[in-house]
Amino acid sequence: MARCPMLSSSHNQDHSGRWTAVWTSLWKTPIILWLLLSDTSLPTVRGQTTVPLETVKLWADTFGRNLYNTVTRYSGSLLLQKKYKDAEPSLKIKEVDGLELVKKFSEDMETMLRRKVEAVESLVEAAEEADLNHEFNASLVFNYYNSVLINEKDDKGNYVELGAEFLLESDAHFSNLRVNVSMSSVQLPTNVYNKDPDILNGVYMSEALNPVFVENFQRDPTLTWQYFGSSTGFFRIYPGIKWMPDENGVIAFDCRNRGWYIQAATSPKDIVILVDISGSMKGLRMAIAKHTITTILDTLGENDFVNIIAYNDYVHYIEPCFKGILVQADRDNREHFKQLVDELMVKGVGVVSQALIEAFEILKQFQESKQGSLCNQAIMLITDGAVEDYEPVFETYNWPDRKVRVFTYLIGREVTFADRMKWIACNNKGYYTQISTLADAQESVMEYLHVLSRPMVINHDHDIIWTEAYMDSRLFTSEAQSLMLLTTVAMPVFSKKNETRSHGILLGVVGSDVTLRELMKLAPRYKLGVHGYAFLNTNNGYILSHPDLRPLYREGKKLRPKPNYNSVDLSEVEWEDQAEILRTAMINGETGSHSMDVKVPLDKGKRVLFLTNDYFFTDISDTPFSLGVVLTRGHGEYILLGNTSVEEGLHDLLHPDLTLASDWIYCITDIDPDHRKLSQLEAVVRFLTGVDPDLECDEELVREVLFDAVVTAPMEAYWTALALNISEESEPGVDVAFLGTRAGLLRRSLFVGSEKVSDRKFLTPEDEASIFTMDHFPLWYRQASEQPPGSFVFNLRWAEGPDSPGKPVAVRASTAVTVTVDGKTAIAAAVGIQMQADYLQRQFWAAMQQCNAVEGPCLKSCEDTDLDCFVIDNNGFVLISERPQEMGRLLGEADGALMKQLLSMGVFSRVTMYDYQAMCKPPDHHHSAAESLFSPLSAFLMVARWLLHECLLFLLEWSAWGSWQDKGSEAKSVFHHSHKHKKQDLLHPCDTEYPVFVHQTAIQEANGIIECGGCQKTFVMQQIPRSNLLLLVTDRTCDCSAHSPILQEATEVKYNASVKCDRMRSQKPRRRPGSCHAFHPEENAQDCGGASDTLPSSPLLLLSLGAWLLPPQLLW
């Protein structure tokens, strides 16, 4: 039978007065009183507990006192607190005006981004002027720097054609890539012939951009990549760079597929894709149709809306959940559609009219209800033929205004239905193309973008677009460059020639990249307090930059972008904003503030802080972005302002063990090449000494660093004297003392040789959580700031390498140093030590030998075989145990029964946390034994199906490649298999929830009995003074291993079909782009396409015939 746990008061010293102690404790702990009174079925505990309460308290007090003496002695925390206390008369504590701060940051960002826009505008002007002065020359011969061929030589040592010598030098400004800052180079995808007359004329014309690229870079040295993407397929990039093919020798990068090109070339659009899945579409035709749909989906972005309808005898929404609506074409929805398209099966007879009617109805309903893009609307009809022109449907739904464009894609080589398909497109302001091979799809699909761009081109509206955050892993091969988050500013380039005005010819798009890291430097970290931060989001509510955005995941030894890294919604990071008040205000571009109580995960989610955050936000003018700044209530609302002389501060800056936060911008060092090799500390010194008057520095931050250097300077002498007193023979213990200040200054002192430091990664970039970064203060600083004044927070660190995974190596202890002026308290610094894990254990076991008024051996000791002793931290992680394998693990893993009891008593609380950026393993699919039994015929048919499928696709691509070779292409004869499925990812994006356990500090001691079947297990818990640690002593004689362990494991949040559908259909509020160009009265709608000139090959025709003769179940 369960017994009621006993609680003892920290004020009760009379062990004999047991009931007095219990009621005293209940009076002081109303939570526990409620727990006791709420379950009257539990009998009281009778008899003397086997764990002596007073002895445990003595142990905790002794260990706590010894530990406090050790950490204060070696860290010098009392001295540092005194030095800041002495400086209080010269200090000011200023209350931060969050609204003014976010406005100032926004203005600075707007100024920076405006310079990028001006650079792009100058490129547009130069390109359009060059085109105006250029006459097309079909026989033009022109050599240019081909990015793939530059510096390449043939067997005789001569440069290959288009591959002349091109000087390349490593440049720190461009992530140490080898570039040529004097000129640009030109890249073409493998499927574009590098000597096609259109290419040669375009490349020749765009040579005029070279001096503009250079001039832009000289005017604004913070510019990164500048480029021009041509509508014909070539890509001119500055600075010039050597382009490396992939492992198959293929250049798959096509600038016309990039988000910046597509967004700049067209206005937002609503698209319904209709795909014929009747029996005539079997085999290769269906493969081409699927590839065409995938290519169309790749041209859509987060400002577009889409749905896909498959038709035969009936109309089928390929995602039934999306019936009757359009959904935002974000990455998740596009990928979902691609999976469903891949599963399409052919059967029946194609009835186009009902599919057209359904598409028109959707578009009409969305337009009338003010949903979707409220701009372009289009229907994409993908079929192998149309038996009529469906004029009645168009008369009813689209004429005479023709507000919905219809684009038709005739699949296959048959031309019987070409005239009808073209008629449909031409009479609905669309475009007709015939797609005979997989290779045709890319160029054919791109035509619709050029048609949609016509109104904008004719009107000469140069809209400026900014993309969502993205990583250009396709463009760059180095990990440093490819994993860098960017946004791109882009503008369209038009032909201004009068003779082609009605055709609305888009020449291409110019753009320039802005790294979000550089942009966020304009929100200096030191102005935001210990827990504060700045973040950016887009008009669609997606995160552009946020310290809690985790865009990468680890696959083996490599970091890879998560599939949905650039469509993480603000509500998925600031998930406490359940009413989406903050999100709604920010996407609407409002200026204001909002407050929330939040749970902030720390230490990779193992810990949590409870904070009240004030959010301040405003928009960034002339961009789709909004900026938010977060300040934490309490010490986060204040900023400390000190002052000292340059001479005194400069002297104290020059100590060899002093460093500054390398991620913070004390001085701008990345513009002038002479400054790029300087550390921030070196730059500050050069600035203060006047050696380099050209350096631009943040004078406020430099002033605070000088002040902190002066105040903390005595710590170096203190630590040095301490180190001299440690003999060589003394047993190893404390190895590092350290401090950090709110200005990013870091000092450390070693008490042992560097080779003997227990954790050598500490305070280095390898342990990012332990240093100041752009995103956060060090973990030890953040935790110390939330500890009661004068107390230390302890953390156990363990090895994570392959040699000794999970082995405890070090314990870190830190405490905050505060300053109070005029009743306002601010955190000035944090100070602490790193000690060996073994040293802490030795101190503990020594303290456990203490007992009261007893001569000789103690009656009880933690070394007794009938007792278990643990030291755990305030999140339940074991720092000390007799069993080393339990150290670093959650108490619930080591003793589930005890953790369960502590939770039920309210000593610990379970806090549920959510992760909406998680990656989960796919569920295992187990097949029944019957399913796994194949007949010989079934096995043969399966193999035959696979072989035939692969042969068909290979010969289809071989046929397409042959047609390019007939035109004289000299590119490598390797075709990019874009239709093939990528290797199945082991992990997929998901939502998870996980528990974090938090000690309730009001309960400093507790004891009780746990029922474990045939025995009772007693325990005592005692707070260790001036720390975040707890001592737990339990009775080992009672085996409670039958109790399940309590783990800190993340579990995937599973949504049933109904909830999942509701989530997929839901349209979160968003702000539409400010401009729309859907129609222009001067548009030449008769420029509406023609037939493909790709010729069939004999082997392909024969194999296609075989595909038609074979039963469809063999093919798909």
Curated annotation (Swiss-Prot):
Domain VWFA: 270-452
Molecular functions per Gene Ontology: calcium channel activity; metal ion binding
CDD domains, alphabetized: vWA_VGCC_like
Binding, a divalent metal cation: 276, 278, 280
Listed transmembrane segments: 1095-1115
Disease: Defects in Cacna2d4 are a cause of cone-rod dysfunction. Mice display affected retinal ribbon-type synapses. The retinopathy is accompanied by a substantial loss in the activities of the second-order neurons. Rod photoreceptor responses are maintained with reduced amplitude, whereas cone activities are absent.
Quaternary structure (record): Dimer formed of alpha-2-2 and delta-2 chains; disulfide-linked. Voltage-dependent calcium channels are multisubunit complexes, consisting of alpha-1 (CACNA1), alpha-2 (CACNA2D), beta (CACNB) and delta (CACNA2D) subunits in a 1:1:1:1 ratio. Interacts with CACNA1C and CACNB3.
Designated name of the protein: Voltage-dependent calcium channel subunit alpha-2/delta-4
